[in-house]
Amino acid sequence: MVHAPARSEDIREEVAELLGVDVDAVQPGSNLIGQGLDSIRIMTLAGRWRRRGIAVDFATLAETPTIEAWAQLVTAGRQDTDSAAPPADSSGDPSGETEPFALAPMQHAMWVGRQDNQQLGGVAGHLYVEFDAGLLDSGRLRAAATALARRHPMLRVRFLPDGTQCITPAVECGDFPVHVEDLRELGTDEVERRLTALREAKSHQQLDGAVFELTVTLLPGGRSRLHVDLDMQAADAMSYRTLMADLAALYRGCDLPELSYTYRQYRHAVEAQDAQPQPRRDADRDWWARRLPELPDPPALPITAGRGANRSTRRWHWLDPQTRDALFARAQARGITPAMALAAGFANTLARWSSNSRFLLNVPLFGRQPLHPDVDALVGDFTSSLLLDVDLVGAHTAAARAQVVQDAMRTAAAHSAYSGLSVLRDLSRHRGTQVLAPVVFTSALGLGELFSPEVTGQFGTPAWIISQGPQVLLDAQVTEFDGGVLVNWDVREGFFPPGVIDAMFAYHIDELLRLASADDAWDAPGPAALPEAQRAVREAINGRTAPPSGEALHDRFFRQAERQPDAPAVFAGSGDLSYAQLRDQALAVAAALRAAGAGAGDTVAVVGPKSAEQIPAVLGILSVGAAYLPIGADQPRDRAERILQSGRVRLALVCGGRQLSLPVPGLVLADVLGGAPADAEIACARVDPGELAYVLFTSGSTGEPKGVEVTHDAAMNTVEFIGRHFEIGPADRCLALSTLEGDISVMDVFVTLRTGGAIVVVDEAQRRDPDAWARLIDTHRVTVLHFMPGWLEMLVEVGRGRLSSVRVVPTGGDWVRPEVVRRLRAEAPGLRFAGLGGATETPVHNTIFEVTEPIPADWTALPFGVPLPNNVCRVVGDTGGDCPEWVPGELWVSGRGIARGYRGRPDLTAQRFVEHDGRTSYRTGDLVRYRPDGTLEFVGRADHRVKISGYRVELGEIESALRRVPGVRTAVAALIAGAGESDVLAAQVGTDDPALTGEQVRQYLADLVPAHMIPRHVAVVERIGFTAAGKLDRRAVARELHSVVGQSHSPGHRAASTPLEGALALILGDLLGRDDVGVDDDFFALGGDSVLATQAVARIRAWLDAPDVMVADMFANRTVSALAAVLRAAEDDPDRLDHVAELYLEVIGMDAESVLTATRQTTKS
């Protein structure tokens, strides 16, 4: 028995041994982190001492890292009652060495995760290495490998379908196969081609039956390449080092000491130990349980839609000894261990490329309990894991980030008696869906060189290394190599957009080199995550400028009226107007306003139904230097009065020919238009472009409308661009559908009139009638449509044969389906179509994407495009930095085209209009991302970001995936309050396919998004309605979905209707600890996990005589009804299982005496 350290000197000796230094180099009062002790080795000591009966933990040791402090902690912690229990029997059962035994927790996770139906599954835990050597003797290597397989039973392991493993006796295995590829007679190019093909085949294979494979390629010039492939379900990374060291020794002809202990015995002893009372483990489990509701998601890295390729790729960089020493010394001077310095650099890179800067990081641990002297020489899986809750939101320097990560490591390690894998299973049960931690940081610092001199001496230098693991996206590894540190990333690259991993890795390495080079780099803000090439693209597309005209919105109209007085300006059902007539009406409005005391700096409301008379009203208001504020006819009276008051309205012009009772003075517009016009010189009076032009009230999140103040110059940036870009002129006719309250009306009125075109007015009676729009387009040969996407959807449904005159369609404000573009161009060949992004606060548009080429078939919506001239668009992450390509963040717009702020709301203005780098930016609340070509892509709205099963999810991302389902035109996702349960994700889709079902949509989504993003309910309708503003009517959809969800819960769960369903419900309910499992209930949503699924399969096989059922069946068929259907389908006689289930149900209902009596009767018969 190993005794606990009793003196400081004993502790010094243990620390010196771990550091690989002389004991005199370890000073009692010195900071051990500064002397090279890292987190992993502190954890090793903590675990070692706890097993010796000393109550210490990693966090306490790490907080006071000196020999003197540790001696006091060890003395005080000797009476640990947790470890005072009698030690578990470590001998195991050697006589049963070939009997099946349970998988270790990490083995089980890999066994389940490698199945194709798992998230990020379909691959094995796998390590592949190539060594370049001289001429290897394949016969000697075969003999060495045969001896190696006899020495290590886990090289002869078989993984059984029931989730157990067993060892094949050595006598049944024969010689270990060593494959030989002879390429000595081939030319250089062919040799390289064959080596590449061999690497491609072996580096991603799933070994079938074998867990260890050796291949020797004989090369020209007396050279060889050794290919080593290991299934890591059989042996972890530390075991790989043991295997290669033993293989090298056996190849040299050395005799290795016999092992008197096996991995199977070790697992037996650990399980026996785990079965004993474990107060520390129970306390740590309770600690994690309290934290489950607040644990974050994994890093939300940019992932491509659909299922990516299973192949892994590697990025690597070698930090030479000088760089390593400088980096580690600077870290240790700040009390940061080397491993945590490297982990912090990795975490910072993740935060820069993630839409969440607080995330879960998976940290594997290599730890073997000292249950036998031979434990360190064994091969098997000894790994566990920690989950780190990393929060870098407020950490703006490298030193701060390193401290955050180190603190997170200490916190997790202080509660490591309950493993990270167990926490993930609990978190999955808590959220009702499978939770993964697919981003991994693996530190092998302190474990010695990756390949010992003995290994490289026999087999040569490593030429290629790659690993992969099931349910892992990115595994960052740091290990000691060739005197320095090797930094590797093994990545499932097919899941990421092109270029993302290269940019991330380059940023990571650049930061490590920067921190190694200078002390002040630790205390300065980190560099922006934008690689130079990305920065150049951003600067180019944001650097486009166009000289402003210096005009107010109405100026050019009055000049056009002088130039072409008889040209048509307005076509309306109430009567057409020439430019001269429209000018006179506008001046009549101006005269009436002046007579009423309204002028420069005032705000005048335009109240009432949409009509042609509103056009001279706004022109007259602007001509006297006032700003207009529209209030439509469908505004509730209370809301209209609040707008008039908060809008500080001086006077109201009332449309529709009738006086209203208003809280402000009012003039009937029909009366005003017939009055005498003001002096002509008023049309030439200069209004400063910096003055307000209009105030538009939009819905506020608090329920109180907010008034956006827009200057002439801000609006003119878009007006001038649209007119110039689309070459709009006197021959054009614009159909004005938008009400004045919608900012698209600014385009309808001012783009058209400043360029000499004519406005075709859609009045109040027509604005909800798409057929009327089509008639007006056809009658007046309309050429320009400033339409919302929803209006276009309605128009193409009814406009066939009547849209040929249309030549320009700028649209925006909602998702724009490519199909709309195709249908419009079928009606109007040569049509110029553009999707534009924008907001009332960035009047009217801030980006443009003109469709000039065929739209790719996989696009579900048009992107926002590139910024308009004089605008700058930033995509900002939650740390305040610019997001790299493909990473979503909030769109911030600055430049000429932004509003002044919110009327009477300085608090809201300060919140949304922020100062940054000397300029004012408007925070749009739109979630967007930059593509590599500088195109902005709309992802969703920040206010559509919801929590689903504990995950933060963009509803827009779900809607985008829904639109990828064949047959789906439009989609709206919503979070609906469930009946007596947590909120439910639901969706409504519009389709032309009458055969499409909600379940089919859900099944298709399984290949596009994770399980937690698949709506529980999908309602299929012929079409989703639009609001009067031309946007998808989300409120109406939410009401309909609420009804659907409520109806689905009202009857309660469906009970079993057959004996088989009853038996399955009973088996699953027993494992879940509940007696109310319905046949449609999701096993995993009720708290099931991979371990319980394995147990369920074992019981179903044994108790229902269904030997072919697999764990994969449980994951693919998550309900009792679905599982019963699969079991029946596999039977020649589908009724047989019901008979077996009847017997099971009968037996399970008997007491012990009844079972014994029945058994005796059966035996006699």
UniProtKB/Swiss-Prot annotation:
Disulfide bonds: none annotated. Pathway: Siderophore biosynthesis; mycobactin biosynthesis. GO terms for cellular component: cytoplasm. GO terms for biological process: amino acid activation for nonribosomal peptide biosynthetic process; lipid biosynthetic process; secondary metabolite biosynthetic process. Residues 578-973 are annotated as: Adenylation. Residues 5-78, 1055-1131 form the Carrier domain. Gene3D superfamilies: 3.30.300.30, ACP-like, alpha/beta hydrolase, Chloramphenicol acetyltransferase-like domain, N-terminal domain of ligase-like, Nonribosomal peptide synthetase, condensation domain. Keywords: Ligase, Multifunctional enzyme, Phosphopantetheine, Phosphoprotein, Repeat. Residues 97-393 are annotated as: Condensation/cyclization. PANTHER family: FATTY ACID SYNTHASE, NONRIBOSOMAL PEPTIDE SYNTHETASE. Residues 77-100 are annotated as: Disordered. It comes from the Bacteria. Belongs to the ATP-dependent AMP-binding enzyme family. MbtB subfamily. Involved in the initial steps of the mycobactin biosynthetic pathway. Putatively couples activated salicylic acid with serine or threonine and cyclizes this precursor to the hydroxyphenyloxazoline ring system present in this class of siderophores. Its EC number is 6.3.2.-. This is Phenyloxazoline synthase MbtB. 4'-phosphopantetheine is transferred from CoA to a specific serine in each of the two carrier protein domains, leading to their activation from apo to holo forms.
